[in-house]
Amino acid sequence: MGLGFSGCQNGDAPAVHADMTKTPTEILKNFEMNDTKNGEKTTTLIATEARIYEAQNYADVDQPLLYFYKAGKESSRLKAPQGRVQTETHEVECWGGVTVVSADSSTLTTERLRYDPKVQKIFSNDAVHLEKPDSITDGIGLETDPELKVVKIGHQTAHMRKGMTQ
């Protein structure tokens, strides 16, 4: 896997007397991170700001947009108010009202979720709502691919949309 960061550094240096475990090592505006696997781009994370904490190996990001790619094309996108990126594993966790929209307009909404790039899956332990062209599913807990094609939802209630055949 590859990882690339870009952004503009904030000119303000952290206060010398501050607790350095709670003070970001760097603050980047217009943050962008690209992730690749076997030379092919798998995700791009864009955020208005990233606060990097080097000692803890993570970055907190504001208004993250996470683009997922399959075979070189965008397959879905995630949008959230807040997120955190593990800088060593590239795992992304988002919260505050998360939405994932796939290329076929399937839409997943939940309060919090996590993307694991090692297995290329999205996970959530929270209540989830999934709207597909032919159905609506609500439940607690989720495991899915970023394209929202292979989805496992716990404690689910599903409804077929009117006018759709099975």
Give a label for each model feature:
Residues 1-166:
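Mature-chain termini and adjacent capping regions
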